[in-house]
Amino acid sequence: GREIAMTQRSASLMRELGLWQRIHDTDPAALSPLRDAKVLNGASPFSMMIGHTLTNRSELGWLVSNHLIRRAAFAEVDAAAKAHGRITLMTGQPITRVLSQGAAAAGSAPAAGSAGSAAGTGDMTEVLLADGTTHRARLLVAADSRFSPTRRAMGVGASMHDFGRTMLVCQMTHEVPHNHVAWEWFDYGQTLALLPMNDDPVTGEHRASTVLTLPHQRIEPLLTMDEEAFGEEMSRRYHGRLGKMKLTSTRHNYPLVGVMPHRLVARRFACVGDAAVGMHPVTAHGFNFGLLSVNTLADELRLAHASGRDIGSPDLLARYERRHMLATRPLYEVTRLIATLYTTEAAPAKLLRNAALHLGQRFTPFRKLVAASLTGSL
């Protein structure tokens, strides 16, 4: 349903995990380079440009379809399960209740992969699944969305910021080439984004993932509008800068709610992915932070397992929480402020928006900092 803007660091992790090669083998054209990015405000053609020339890379990042990432991840886990026999996939069975923490019922077998822990065999977390079965493990990890029911079941609260907006996402072809430049356009009354995809390998048409953000009630009519009228409407909303536009995919809508958990860990429990931080998409860091959380936690688990230490120890989980909070909390707060400022329509806010954009363009060190955050040079 949507394209993922991926930093160079995330692309590197994807390669290490074997996912990049799987996607490339399936559809090489699905890996689209994101060379530059520009930020626009209102109807002005002026933009703040974050170019790859500010870095030592030929692109800032990459654009990959979310469904291809999911498919590759499933295939990689399935292959590992068949190769090692120590992984069990139980799909479509959400956790309905966390039954216990700490000493669990005697006689129950530990979950797969719990061997090698220094903790006693009774020190486990037990969960009840929708099919009525119970399972025990030394560590329970929630990766079930920013509104994580597992996080809630563990008694971990979260601060939520509802932006009162919904974004509509779809793929479209367009006449004017995008030159692999991403757009973030804070127009008046709407926010637009363009994520550049590779040209259609069959027709040669220019393609992009387009994102339109509006108040909830104004998105609904666009979801059911006929395709020709929708193309005309989107061309108008992009002020004709992409020429004629044509819908080439289904349309998807997502309410914009930022979520920051009060904690990332509890007793024998950790949050990763969107369950660890739910970002506003304006900085395109949601997936990247999710992948970072998995890598950070995995680092801690590997070190503990290699030295025979408990993979669910309070010290290990505290280190993970500190590392990931430090990596994500500052940008979460900055993103929330940016999204609020650039959707405020009052006259003083419009002046401030314009001034900030011009200042950012003139202050090259700032643009280099943004570019470095995308390429992983920080």
Regions found by a protein language model. Give the residues of each.
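Conserved FAD/dinucleotide-binding core of flavoprotein oxidoreductases
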Residues: D187-Y254
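Glycine-rich FAD cofactor-binding loop and adjacent beta-loop-alpha segment at the N-terminus
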Residues: G1-L34
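Active-site metal-binding loops of divalent metal-dependent hydrolases
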Residues: S145, F269, A275
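Conserved N-terminal helical subregion
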Residues: I23-T26, L31-A153, H161-T166
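Glycine-rich phosphate/pyrophosphate-binding beta-alpha loops
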Residues: T191-A193, V257-M260, A276-N288, L326, ...
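Central beta-strand plus flanking loop segment that forms part of the substrate or channel wall
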Residues: S12, G18-L19, F147-W183, Q190-L192, ...
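FAD-binding beta-loop-beta segment adjacent to the flavin cofactor pocket
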Residues: Y254-C271, R329-P330, T340-L341, A346-P348
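C-terminal helical "tail/cap" subdomain of flavin- and related membrane-associated enzymes
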Residues: D299-L378
